Amino acid sequence: MTWTVIFTVKAERDLAKLPDDIAKRIILKIETIAENDPYDQLDRMTNSPYYKFRVGVYRGIVNIVNDKMILQLVRARHRSQVCEPHLVKT
């Protein structure tokens, strides 16, 4: 089953600030994750309800809404910035 992918406003802003090729790779990656079981491809963040994935040195932060089969991209940033706790609040 395919999951639905949605983007938060902050994630859309993050993607707009990234180089075009990186933003496209992040979007392609989350769409690929949505086609399969996301739990096999995402890592849970420590002490957080969110999950993460890597695209080179960039990270995507994802919220999974199980009952509706939705993957919500919360943030997409360089790895040095994305794991700061205040950045993943929606």
Listing of model-derived features with the role each one plays in the protein:
Residues 2-4, 17, 21-24, 55, ...:
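Enriched for short, Lys/Arg-rich terminal
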Residues 15-18, 33:
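Hydrophobic recognition helices of helix-based DNA-binding modules
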Residues 29-54:
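A short, surface-exposed loop/turn module that caps and links secondary-structure elements
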